[in-house]
């Protein structure tokens, strides 16, 4: 896990969880709850169209649609500010349970045994 200072949203930290098999999952903490970049989760699970996966599987109350000056932003590897769709823990599980791929089970194990405990420990 790495921690990045979010320059657009002062005081907001982006936690990046790395896994050799699945890739990276970027997370922000809002009101003491983790919110995950939906695209990261969908890609880790093997969805070929992350927008469709989020639209089809994640309820509206479990996601925040990215909007400039309204929602948290993240900075990508090229230094560009982005306003992604964030999903909460319920949305995370919705994507996991919606996946028919075998690696969804391993991804769920990684998230529940490493990612979520680390978030709860470091906040």
How would you label these PLM feature ranges?
Residues 1-123:
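An anion-engaging/catalytic patch
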């Amino acid at each position: 896990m790495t921690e990045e200072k979010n320059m657009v949203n002062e005081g907001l930290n982006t936690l990046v969880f790395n896994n050799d098999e699945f890739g990276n999952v970027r997370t922000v903490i809002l009101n003491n709850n983790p919110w995950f970049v939906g695209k990261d989760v969908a890609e880790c699970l093997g969805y070929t169209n992350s927008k469709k996966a989020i639209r089809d599987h994640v309820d509206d109350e479990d996601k925040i649609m990215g909007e400039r000056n309204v929602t948290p932003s993240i900075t990508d590897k090229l230094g560009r500010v982005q306003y992604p769709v964030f999903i909460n823990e319920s949305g995370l599980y919705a994507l996991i349970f919606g996946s028919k791929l075998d690696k969804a089970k391993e991804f769920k194990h990684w998230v529940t045994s490493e990612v979520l405990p680390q978030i709860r420990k470091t906040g």
